[in-house]
Each structure stands twice: as structure tokens, then as C-alpha cells.
Amino acid sequence: MSNMQQKTDVILIGAGIMSATLGSLLKELAPEWEIKVFEKLASAGEESSNEWNNAGTGHSALCELNYTSEKSDGSIDISKAVKVNEQFQLSRQFWAYLVKSKLIRNPQDFIMPLPHMSLVQGEKNVQFLKNRFEALSKNPLFQGMEFSDAPETLKKWLPLIMEGRTSNEPMAATKIDSGTDVNFGALTRMLFDYLKTKDVELNYKHSVENIKRTKNGLWEVKVHDMNSGKIEHHTAKFVFIGGGGGSLPLLQKTGIPESKHIGGFPVSGLFMVCKNQKVVEQHHAKVYGKAKVGAPPMSVPHLDTRYIDNKKALLFGPFAGFSPKFLKTGSNLDLIGSVKPNNVLTMLAAGVKEMGLTKYLIQQVMLSHEKRMEELREFIPNAKSEDWDIVVAGQRVQVIKDTDAGGKGTLQFGTEVVSAADGSIAALLGASPGASTAVHVMLEVLEKCFPSRMVEWEGKIKEMIPSYGISLTENPRLFQDLHTSTGRTLGLNEKETVHN
């Protein structure tokens, strides 16, 4: 056992896409800072960022219907869709900067062009999709989107989905070719490979046991070296907790006022994966449907082409599951251990409020393989049971907190940064849109935690991310220029791959 304190400038907890992004930004902005990373698992990007543990959608609201809500008068509120799209553009720009600067290579290993489509059935839903298409088409971020309710067009766009369909129920789809499939696991590993060349100390199989404030205002992180069994103590001026579902328990250990009255509810995801390559080759898009009435936002069904290890795959889901673990590799005591005197009422209030979610999860857990196949056949009528296996994806911990709008124990479905008033420590909580908006979220961490540095850093940030602080919606020419240039750098504008 070692009680020696080892000092550093920055500690990043968790080797996922968020820590990888923050570390990469900091190494460009403050190259002299010493950074240490602690990860419980044996390598980077193995939990939520792993390619099998998330949907791999470059979330930019091109096809996700839950980002566009219908108002009482039938008009469509696109504000959330615009926000998510603007945030994804920041990620695209930063990734393109890294590729252009040769800090990471071979972008086709982590991002591929792929049409994003929305698909609905029923007269009311067709009208909703048409209204959505018309509202989004007025915005430059969504240019190139097409709408069709003509069966012949749908057969061309969606051959696998339309084959064997006997229902006369009206159907419609939108299609936009500027969508992407992102392998966040591969990207995370690339970023940590780059950070290693910049002398960032990567410590795998190191579990953070405690975080506490020292008398001189630093943060002391107690770390268990799982290789040697030793306990280490590291201190830093700034700590980022980017441990996915494991972030909430660590945030609670800090004791900062901002960590109080926050709870977490874990939801696990399952996907069906097609093992018949002939079927896989018949589909080429991410196709998002509409969540069923009463189902939570994370239940939106989608049929996705994926590129994993440079091989085409086909996944359908998600189906929800329940586990009290906050991480896929976590403990069954995670949920009960997160209940504290300061959040127990918040958690209980959520339990009463969210009976619909509880009922939904119970129904999902009880589904047999054949019942899941029935849901899949709503997308692929001719789907055969023997062609599909189930894979368990990652855990997502939905944030529960008290809000002015929702009252006590309100379930949050977004991604949220919680930081100390003095900016010395920050944690990332929540789920979707998550990894797609990593650059936006980590810029938010910089703004909250290093406000005195932002004027000094602004020039470099704008070199890396040209639309930082600018609305692309209000600057369509800039959007077009950046979309074209980042697309060229990332190999998204043409079919051939980019090697550099």
C-alpha cells in the first residue's frame, strides 16, 4: 500500500469518448499541462463508447423523430433538432481538424457516410412526418432531405423493409444522404493513441475508489491499482469524471453541493443483430421509426446499417432491459448504493411519477425471442428468426433530479455536466445524444471550469472548430463551406476511402 501523493495538473476518470475528447482539446490548448487518465478496464473505449454498446448514430436529428415535437396546433417545434444538429457539426469539425493535422488517421475506420431515414405508418403519422419535413427543409442544416409517401419510391429507398409488405396502411419516409455511422469505440482508441504520443499517462486496470478535497484546495483521488493491488493517491488542480454510468457514485463522493439531490436510474439496452450477410447487404441506411404511445424516448425503434471492424452489419432495436448495475461491468449494488439521505426523496418521487416507465421495462424484460421478432417484422416483414441473434448493449443511467418545470424526482433524458462552483471538478451524467455531441459537451466543461482561460484559448478553439460560438442556422454559407470541407477531410463526400 502506498500513501504517497503524486501531483498532476489534470486527472481524467474513465477512458471513454468524453475523457478522450477533453484530453485532446486540453493537449491542443495547454500542451504543457500534465494529464493522467485512470480507467478500471483493461483498455480504452470498452464501456458505453464501445461500438457494440451504443447505436453508432451520428446524432444530428436528421432522422430521430423524438427531437421534433408536435405542438397542439399541429405545427412542428424544430428547436431541439437544430440544437442537436449544430452540436454534431462541432464534433465533425474537430474530428476533421484532427485528421487534417495528422493527429488521427484513416477516418473511414471511425466514420462512414450513410443515409438517415425516418419511417412512419398510419395517416396521422404520415401527416406528422410531412409537416416535420416541411419545417426542417426551411433550415439550411437539413438541406437535401427528401419526403415520399409513394410506394414505388419507398421500394427503391427501402427494399428490405418494403419486400413482402401486405398492409394497405399509408406509409411515408424522409431520406437525407448526409447522415453518418460513427464507430465511437474506434474513435476513442484513436484519440487515446494520440494522447499517448503527447505524454498523457494512461493507467488501465486502475479503479478510482474515492475523491476528496485537500486542505490546500486540490482534489485527492484514491486509486486501486488492480494489477499490483496497491493503493495510490494522486492530487490534481482539476478532475473530470467521465465514467459513464459510474460517474454518479464518484460525483457523490466529492461532497460538492451540486452533487446533492441527484439520482440515477439504470436502463440496459439490447439489440438484434443479423447473422445472414445476404440480408445485411439488402439494407443501406439508418431508419428510425416513431416510439409507441406511452413509451419513453429511448425506445424509438431503428434498423441500422453499421460498420464495425470495417465490416457491414445490420442491427435492430433497442429493446430495454433492467439491471441495477450502473455499468455493464458494474455491481448489482450500484443502484441501491447511489441512494443517499440527500436524494432519497427525489428517487422516491421519481418512482411514483414514472410508473409508465416501470411498466414498460417489465414488459420489455418479459419479451421472448419470438415477441422481439414480431417487433422486427414491423420493419422487415420477411425476417426469419434463425437469421437474428440478441446482443446486450451498454447501460445508460438516466438522471433524476428536482426541476422547476417537472417538480421533484423528474427523469432527464439528456446529457448533463455537473461542476463545482469554482470549476475545479466536473462530471458528465446522462445518456443520449451523448457521444455525438462530445465536443460540444467538453467545450461546455472548458467554459464552466476554465472561464479565465477562454479569451486566451478562443483563437485556437476557432482554428479547430470554426463554428464555435456561431449559429450555423443563421450563417448558411459558413455551414455549406464547413460541411463540404469537413466532409472532404473525413471522406464523407465521395465513396472512395481516405488514407493519409
Curated annotation (Swiss-Prot):
It catalyses: (S)-malate + a quinone = a quinol + oxaloacetate. Pathway: Carbohydrate metabolism; tricarboxylic acid cycle; oxaloacetate from (S)-malate (quinone route): step 1/1. The keyword Flavoprotein applies. Its EC number is 1.1.5.4. This is Probable malate:quinone oxidoreductase. InterPro entries: FAD/NAD-bd_sf, MQO. Its cofactor is FAD. It comes from Bacillus cereus (strain ATCC 10987 / NRS 248). The gene is mqo. Keywords: FAD, Flavoprotein, Oxidoreductase, Tricarboxylic acid cycle. GO terms for molecular function: 2-hydroxyglutarate dehydrogenase activity; L-malate dehydrogenase (quinone) activity. HAMAP family: MQO. Belongs to the MQO family. NCBIfam families: mal_quin_oxido, PRK05257.1-1, PRK05257.1-3, PRK05257.1-4, PRK05257.2-1, PRK05257.2-4, PRK05257.3-1, PRK05257.3-2. GO terms for biological process: tricarboxylic acid cycle. Pfam families: Mqo.
